[in-house]
Amino acid sequence: PAVRVETVEPVGAVGGGSAPAGRRVGSVALVGAGPGDPELITVRGRRLLAEADVVVADRLVPRLLLDELRPEVELVDATKIPHGPAATQEEINRVLVERALAGATVVRLKGGDPYVFGRGGEELLACAEAGIPVTVVPGVSSPIAAPAAAGIPVTHRGVAHEFTVVSGHLPPDHPDSLVDWAALARLRGTLVVLMGLTNLPSIVAALLAYGRDPDTPAAVVQEGTTGAQRVLRSTLATVAADARSA
């Protein structure tokens, strides 16, 4: 198995930096691991994993991809569990920069796509400020893949000509929420809510209050594209209660 570093050390935010004299600067690749099934990583993403000296991985990354790393690879666990112990983004940025400045080929492996609720943009900026070359490898994103695996097309001729992806991490009435739920309720297309199970009752209440049809078909997909996938089909009016009793 790869060399495993269970957590990153708590240090300050990354600023600039430079490689030691006479040592080449390494590189960082922000790689999307896909929605859960390890076979859904891109060909390029898998190749970069095979070439990496250091892999910094999140909780949502398929374990099989990590088990296949070369024995000498340093695996840094950047687990970010919602509402629990977490490596701060500044710590993760610091590890990426530090390892690359030491000459390593670093892969930042993230569930789904690096730029879809993955803070890939913040990591790109941290590396750019330190003068480190960055490659971005898009990943198959769960807002499309999970519905597809459940047999639900996000667009369908004559039914949905658009789909919208939003975070459900914050409830609709939270002061930090940037989501316009009133506007979403007026749309006719498919609405995909990520990280929304905890706040599902308040999300449903907001959409209904703003006029979304209570008979709108609704589904909850858990562990999409994996062997543990579960799908609940319902309507907007009843999905919160159905999910609670499932």
Question: Which residue ranges define each predicted feature?
Answer:
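Short, functionally important structural connectors and interaction interfaces within domains
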Residues: G32-A33, A52, A57, G84, ...
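Class I S-adenosyl-L-methionine
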Residues: P1-P38, V43-V140, A145, A240
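Short, solvent-exposed amphipathic alpha-helical segments in soluble enzyme
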Residues: V43-L48, L69-V73, E122-C127, G151-I152, ...
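Class I SAM-dependent methyltransferase SAM-binding "motif I" and its flanking Rossmann-like core
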Residues: G111-L187, R230-R233
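Short secondary-structure transition/capping segments
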Residues: L69-R70, Q89-E90, P147-G151, S167-H169, ...
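Short hydrophobic/aromatic-enriched beta-strand-loop microsegments
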Residues: V73-K80, G131-T135, V154-T164, G211-V220
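A contiguous loop/helix-start segment that scaffolds small-molecule binding in enzyme catalytic cores
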Residues: P1-V28, L101-V106, E162, S167-A246
